[in-house]
Amino acid sequence: MTEVSDRQAPHRRVPGPARPVRPGAQRRPGPGARPARRPVPPRKAAPPALRLGSPRPRLRMIGLALTLVLIAFVVRLLQVQAVDASTYAAKAEQNRYVVHTLPAERGGITDRNGVALASTVDSYDITADPTMFTREQLKVGDGPEQAAALLAPILGEDQEALAAKLRPKNKDLRYVRLARGKTPEVWNQIKDLKTALGKKADEDESAVNVLAGVFADPSSKRVYPNGSLAAGILGWVNSEGEGSGGLERKLDRTLAGEDGEIRYAQSGGRQVPTIGANEKPAVPGSGVELTIDRDIQWAAQHAITEQVKESKADGGYVIVQDTRTGEILAMANSPGFDPNNLSDADPAALGNAALQDAYEPGSTAKVMSMAAVLEENAATPATHVVVPNRLHRGDRLFKDDVDHPTWHLTLNGVLAKSSNIGTILATGQLGKTQREANQVLYSYLRKFGLGSYSGLGFPGETKGILAPPGQWSTSQQYTIPFGQGVSINAMQAASVYSTIANGGVRVAPTLVRGTKGPDGRFTPAPEPEKTRVVSEKTAKTLSRMLESVVDDEEGTGTKARIPGYRVAGKTGTANRVDPATGKYRGYTSSFAGFAPADKPRVTVYCAIQNATQGSYFGGQICGPIFKQVMEFALKTLQVPPTGAAPANLPVTFKP
């Protein structure tokens, strides 16, 4: 049985209502009661709680941004690894490997006998490090000046200019070029002096090697061993080694060759020895052999230079040509220039005036008028021509170079005495009307090469001026037959006489005989173009008429006679157009001819522009030049003297 307790559950005491405290009464603490607590001050009200936003939107934005960045990295990685992989691999390869150019050696230029006219030699650019000339380095304040004083006479440079380069305004400059293209001998001289100063400085502490900062960069240099000889033909190369004038420019691709290269791996700026280098050798340029004969060129250049000085002329030219082949044996200009030292050259003298100057030829052009008259059977050498002192044609009054009574000349005499009036009368027979005569004459002038380029392809060459007959003025209809109102260059004039000498066949002039490749094999130049201009009969008749100009006492070319040889030639004296004003001022004096007249080998043409001292007549100042150059050429080429006597054609007739 379950025991039942008789205890009752304790009852919770419920406090009754508090009794009111009487005024002045104090509550006494009972025994064991706790002491009364101080009253607790009322608590401050808590600030209202902030309502925090949800972090989820921010987390979404951050996640989205990180996703986009990751996508960009992935896209870029795909681009680098897949799309542009080859490009970057090539760049890496390029950065890893270094390529150096191996310059090709420029081919040389020689005359027809193998004599060097232009060649390439080793040279040095003299350089310096200006920081090695300071007071701190040399312990002296005038180091640049001392070095300049030693270098100036060796380099041929201005001492003050050298000192200025060694003391630049930029104190951090480490490289200056003191001189360009010096010979190995010059660098050896500087190097020996530098070594001597260095040895002295090692032995004596007070001594200073002021050349310690001078160095040299190996290079190459184009040299012309004969100086100004044939400079107008050869031209020159620029500082980059490229042809900039004459044949150096025209044949630049042939002469330059093909640069090679060497390619090797690098690391830290140094070649990696375990990885082989790939080398593509340079292909040297081909050598060029000219038709020029150096000795004949010298004779022509010397003769024209001396005569230009003596006559105080503006300039002049001489051309020597092989009548049979068209090869040019000499082409000389005065004034000239030295391609080794272009800084001292007159800019007006650069180029080749014999091909670039266009001028009115004067009476040397009468041979073409006579060729037309003979070829058209309008007259013969014996045809009578009555030449008055004055002749009215159109609105002009024409005269010869001298006053004279009425001349009774043969056609041969018209050419021998160089009569302008006689030439007008003769060419007037080329047609029933003056218009027809003009057209016939024009066709022959074109056949002789006037108004066309010579075929040399020379830079800057002029083709002259020959207007169609329909554009000829009234006066030109009568002046063109005697060489006024039409312009040519010296090469065209020489070619006219070579055509007559060659039996009426014009052979295009040539300057290049062939090229010699790096393998030493010679390749001849193409055969020149040949064109028949007049018949062989007409050419031979003209040749005999031209002999009268030189041999007959009444001829204008007596100063061109050469003992032992038959000479055919023609003088010319033309009013000259001043290039500066476009008006006539002075004269063009000329002489053209060939020898031996019976078996022509050589043609020589000479012209002088604006002679101001002595005679200006072509026969007087150019005849002697022709003789001097022709004699030299005939001897050089070993042409035997003439055996047959010259033909005597009548010059005058009795009315």
Question: Where does each model-flagged region fall?
Answer:
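N-terminal targeting leaders characterized by basic, low-complexity, disordered sequences
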Residues: 1-35
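Small/polar-residue-rich segments within soluble enzyme cores
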Residues: 2-9, 146-153, 164-284, 606
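Hydrophobic alpha-helical transmembrane signal-anchor segments
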Residues: 2-8, 34-40, 53-87
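Short, small/polar residue-rich loop motifs at catalytic or cofactor-binding pockets
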Residues: 96, 101-105, 312-316, 509
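Short beta->alpha transition motifs characteristic of CBS
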Residues: 120-125, 129-131, 330-336
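Beta-lactam-recognizing serine transpeptidase/beta-lactamase-like catalytic domain environment
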Residues: 266-277, 322-363, 368-612, 618, ...
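Conserved, well-ordered alpha-helix/loop/beta-strand core segments that scaffold catalytic motifs
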Residues: 272-316
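Short, gly/Ser/Thr-rich active-site loops of penicillin-recognizing serine hydrolases
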Residues: 522-528, 623-655
